Regions:
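Short, surface-exposed ligand- or partner-binding patches at beta-edge/loop junctions that are enriched
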Residues: 122-147
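Cleaved targeting-peptide boundary
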Residues: 30-37
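Secretory targeting and sorting signals
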Residues: 1-30
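Low-complexity, acidic Ser/Thr/Pro/Gly-rich terminal tails and inter-domain linkers that flank the onset
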Residues: 37-64
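The feature marks short-to-medium sequence segments in extracytoplasmic or secretory-pathway proteins
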Residues: 74-119, 148-150
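Hydrophobic core residues within well-ordered beta-strands of beta-rich domains
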Residues: 50, 67-69, 119
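Short, well-ordered beta-strand segments enriched in hydrophobic/aromatic residues
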Residues: 65-77
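Beta-strand elements of well-folded, non-transmembrane domains
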Residues: 58, 75-77, 127
Length: 151
């Protein structure tokens, strides 16, 4: 009887350690990947995957509250389309600015890329009445921050 109780307690303790180990090893799903400007991040996209590189974040220079980022999208697999609407600029106070809608002559093309090809262009943010942004965030369709680029 004594041996049975010891074995039972040992089994419960071992199961507890296994669960604790699994929880400790699980990645934090809410934490976005943090990168410096100029680094790339691979992001799944409808039709494949894209390596995005955000190189800059700066005011347009026209004193109009518009900021821009230079972005390169390279198709890693399939024929994905860059999802420009998933980019946002963010300030240190958490103010978030959506990308401006509409095609721009120097904008990042919103069309499918063939595997291995890339496109480079600008994405623009309307920051007219807010705090200057310091980062660019890629937020998926579910509203989860996936990647944050900043200096």
């Amino acid at each position: 009887m004594q041996l049975s109780q010891i074995a039972q307690k040992s089994g419960v303790a071992a199961a507890g350690f296994v669960v604790a180990g699994m929880l400790a090893a699980a990645p934090a799903l809410a934490d976005p990947e943090g990168l410096d400007f100029g680094q790339k991040a691979e992001i799944p996209s409808p039709g494949g995957a894209i390596d995005y590189t955000v190189s800059t974040l700066e005011p347009s220079g026209h004193n109009d509250g518009v900021w821009y980022s230079d972005v390169t999208a390279r198709a890693v697999s399939g024929s994905p389309t860059p999802n420009i609407a998933d980019f946002n600029a963010r300030a240190v106070n958490s103010s978030t600015y959506a990308v401006m809608k509409g095609d721009k002559p120097d904008g990042l093309p919103n069309q499918p890329l063939t595997a291995g090809s890339q496109a480079t262009g600008r994405i623009y943010f309307d920051v007219r009445s807010g705090t200057a942004p310091d980062s660019v965030v890629y937020r998926d369709a579910g509203g989860t921050d996936r990647v944050v680029w900043k200096d």
